[in-house]
């Protein structure tokens, strides 16, 4: 850790290093975090993009703060899904980053349109059409990746919750898409596995989802202009956690919520371990690192 000394033009910074062996080869990973600047990364002492380090050292951390996965707002659960998606498929880091950039650009444009009129407003609306298309394409990819992950994670969460809690209630997950809600599609009953399978299947076709998002953005255009917010897309979706047939948020006890949050992290670990075994070379798989804080 480096702190800014009086009279010196050096920002606060910290360096994180990890030495590990992957595929029988030693690796040195370094990330330099600099206050007010972009992070820097090195792989085996050679400069690289931070995204290039993703997936090399797969790590799962459980901490008491993870109770927010059950209790808090949808953005916490979306971040959980997206972090795990990128850990499993590092190539999707670019899709996630591009999506967030386009979303921010579109948000800024919507806010700016409130102050525009005449030809300036017409020009801004034409630009909005361009951002709509880009956002729809990127959001569709992100949604499909999340749904695939939820399907992979679901049995591991159920198993991990049983192991942790020894309870009779079964843990379950459901991905809720703002796109389908905006198009009048009701959420199925959590007990109806066939209906949920159909619901999720409708989100796996990236081209179809992109087209549907673009159409829905057009239908919501006036409301978005009035409110200056993006009303539909991956950024409005949620992951609902169930114990039995009831959502854990609002119905589960503190102990049940704690066990479910831990089960989510343990399930992530088991999923990555299973994936490592499937993609191993010469049958030699490498387990991810599991860190449990205050369990």
List the model feature ranges, each with a label.
Residues 1-68, 74-76, 80-92, 156-162, ...:
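Nucleotide-state sensing region of NTPase/ATPase domains
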Residues 4-7, 119-292:
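Conserved NTPase motor "head" modules and their coupling/switch loops across ABC/AAA+ ATPases, GTPases
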Residues 25-27, 50, 115, 182, ...:
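Intrinsically disordered, low-complexity acidic/polar segments
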Residues 47-56, 63-137, 177:
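A conserved P-loop NTPase coupling/switch region
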């Amino acid at each position: 850790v480096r702190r800014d000394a009086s009279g010196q033009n050096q920002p606060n910074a910290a360096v994180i290093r990890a030495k590990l062996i992957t595929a029988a080869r030693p690796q040195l990973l370094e990330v330099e975090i600099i206050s007010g600047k972009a992070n820097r990364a090195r792989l085996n002492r050679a400069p690289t993009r931070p995204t290039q380090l993703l997936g090399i050292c797969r790590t799962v951390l459980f901490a008491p703060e993870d109770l927010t996965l059950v209790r808090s707002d949808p953005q916490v659960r979306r971040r959980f899904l997206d972090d795990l998606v990128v850990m499993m498929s590092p190539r999707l880091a670019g899709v996630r980053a591009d999506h967030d950039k386009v979303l921010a650009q579109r948000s800024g444009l919507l806010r700016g349109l409130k102050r525009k009129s005449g030809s300036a407003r017409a020009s801004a609306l034409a630009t909005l059409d361009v951002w709509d298309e880009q956002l729809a394409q990127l959001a569709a990819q992100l949604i499909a990746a999340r749904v695939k992950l939820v399907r992979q994670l679901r049995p591991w969460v159920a198993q991990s919750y049983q192991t942790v809690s020894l309870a009779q209630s079964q843990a379950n997950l459901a991905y809720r898409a703002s796109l389908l809600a905006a198009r009048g599609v009701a959420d199925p009953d959590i007990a109806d596995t066939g209906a949920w399978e159909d619901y999720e299947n409708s989100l796996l076709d990236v081209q179809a989802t992109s087209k549907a998002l673009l159409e829905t953005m057009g239908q919501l255009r006036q409301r978005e202009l009035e409110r200056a917010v993006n009303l539909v897309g991956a950024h409005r979706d949620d992951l609902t956690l169930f114990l039995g047939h009831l959502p854990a948020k609002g119905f589960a006890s503190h102990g049940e919520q704690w066990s479910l949050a831990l089960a989510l992290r343990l399930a992530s670990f088991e999923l990555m371990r299973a994936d490592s075994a499937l993609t191993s070379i010469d049958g030699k798989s490498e387990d991810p690192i599991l860190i449990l804080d205050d369990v």
